[in-house]
């Protein structure tokens, strides 16, 4: 990516890696039960949807603003691509452990609670992405920031949804884990760390301040709207 200084295939490559890892786990594991099947399906659905959405977005926009500064610095750009590999493996570690586990415990409350969390998180992420895409597609909004829909309750509702859906995967996976596999429950914590401190939120907050930091409306939006956890805006 650095030779061409392009980030066009970053998210697509990551999504295809998720899909390949899940398909490999399914094809090599003879004990796939209902829990493993649902976790596999959910990760495949998420990866296919997000990968396609982000790839088409960067192709239409011509760039991903998160990478504006990163891609001009070799070591930081290389670190970002390397971190992408860790992103894939650690993020779905709990899911992979459950899919390949031989500990076929009965389906119970954790399974159904995880499904509810995943559907809730996935729905929020999809709606938030569509709302922002529709906002940016309206030429009258060029150069403006979105404050409508879910974006009126959170500055990054899409990332909130992603965190919740991965918590759902870990909750579903939990009963099937044994021994060292419990370490994979770090997965949702890694997602939180990555989205807040390394990628998404951190980069977009910095970018937003550079673009609209002197805008009184933006300052009001920052003051009244939570960074991540949605809430009704304070008047």
Give the predicted meaning of each segment:
Residues 48-55, 85:
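Mid-bilayer segments of alpha-helical transmembrane spans in multi-pass integral membrane proteins
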Residues 6, 52, 72-74, 92-99:
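Intramembrane alpha-helical segments
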Residues 1-6, 52-59:
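C-terminal ends of transmembrane helices
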Residues 4, 9-20, 62-80, 144-151:
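Juxtamembrane helix-capping/reentrant segments at transmembrane boundaries
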Residues 42, 54-66:
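Membrane-helix interface/capping segments
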Residues 12, 75-88, 155-162:
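Select subsegments of transmembrane alpha-helices in polytopic membrane proteins
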Residues 2, 17-48, 88-131, 136-235:
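Hydrophobic transmembrane alpha-helices
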């Amino acid at each position: 990516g650095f030779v061409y200084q392009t980030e066009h295939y970053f998210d697509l490559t990551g999504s295809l890696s998720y899909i390949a890892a899940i398909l490999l786990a399914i094809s090599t594991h003879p004990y796939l039960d209902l829990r493993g099947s649902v976790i596999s399906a959910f990760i495949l659905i998420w990866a296919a949807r997000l990968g396609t959405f982000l790839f088409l977005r960067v192709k239409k926009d011509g760039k991903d603003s998160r990478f504006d500064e990163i891609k001009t610095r070799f070591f930081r750009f290389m670190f970002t691509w390397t971190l992408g590999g860790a992103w894939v493996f650690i993020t779905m570690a709990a899911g992979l452990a459950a899919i390949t586990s031989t500990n076929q415990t009965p389906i119970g409350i954790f399974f159904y609670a995880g499904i509810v969390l995943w559907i809730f998180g996935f729905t929020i992420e999809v709606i938030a992405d569509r709302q922002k895409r529709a906002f940016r597609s309206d030429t009258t909004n060029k150069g403006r920031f979105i404050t409508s829909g879910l974006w009126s309750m959170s500055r990054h509702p899409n990332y909130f949804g992603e965190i919740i859906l991965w918590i759902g995967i870990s909750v579903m996976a939990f009963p099937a884990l044994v021994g060292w596999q419990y370490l994979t429950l770090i997965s949702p914590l890694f997602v939180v760390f990555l989205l807040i401190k390394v990628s998404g939120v951190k980069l977009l907050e910095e970018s937003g301040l550079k673009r609209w930091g002197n805008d009184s409306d933006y300052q009001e939006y920052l003051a009244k709207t939570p960074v991540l956890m949605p809430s009704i805006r304070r008047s």
